[in-house]
Amino acid sequence: MKKFDLIPYYDPYDLWATSFGQNVRKGFYKGHLKSKIMAVGIASCELFIPNLIRKFARTKKSLHPISVAQYILMACENSWISIGESLDYLALLREQAAIDDGESFSFGLGFTWVSKNGIYTSQEPFITHTPYAMEALLKLNSIDPSNLDSIKLFNKTWGFLESLIVMFNGNDKLALSYAPADEPRIVINANSYAALSYALHFINNHDCDKEVAYLKALNIVNWIIYNQRLDGGWMYYADNLPGNFIDCFHSCFVVKNLIKIRALLSLESSELNEAIDNGIDYIINNFYQKDVGLVKRFSVRDIKDP
């Protein structure tokens, strides 16, 4: 792959991250007609006049935690980063952290986000984002093992994992929150990231409680398998309440993370193998459009997300 530089950019969520966009989403989820109309307007501007609307809104190009982490992963995979440059990328990644203190190291969106599950501030760390930074830290450490800063920061993500709220615990099953905050609903794909994170610590963190890391990863996997539908799909939320859905985006995350966990922990489980196979079949049969070589976004939906 041809090398390219990581530079500030416009993001698809720029407009929704503004105070106006946040208020529209709040009203949308409350069912306000005015907010629904405004949401259509924002989406239309994003589709037809993306650059013009950003100039009008005075949106600045920026970097986000997930893009920096993903770039590092790709750059390491393609040998774009030298030993000397690894320190610079480590510093850049650290600048994106939501929490960086003596007890925890974690990452979020980098901007305020309004969802059905609550309002998350720009400094709220997410379990769906932090694992990418964890993997990036491990990659940077592999480039320069003598630099212990990256592995020390990786080890500190344990504090973030342990700060997540237990949403379900019983019968060898465990489910955690999306962020270290009170949330009304359990997000299934988020728990696949939590299980992956504990698996990464089990393999790479020599200071953590290995038994805790292994058991939590395994119990979360058990919970994910338990919540898989008979047709192989996973709902976004682990409930039957309004606003739930199945989309290709998050379905792929669940399957991808389960495959990684199976490899990391060398799990020989017929139930896990079956869950992965059924999940892949669901994605192919319900999302993939063979005639155009693309996938559709939803297979099950309640309301359209703004």
Where are these regions (language model features)?
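Glycan-recognition and catalytic cores of secretory/periplasmic carbohydrate-active enzymes
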Residues: 1-306
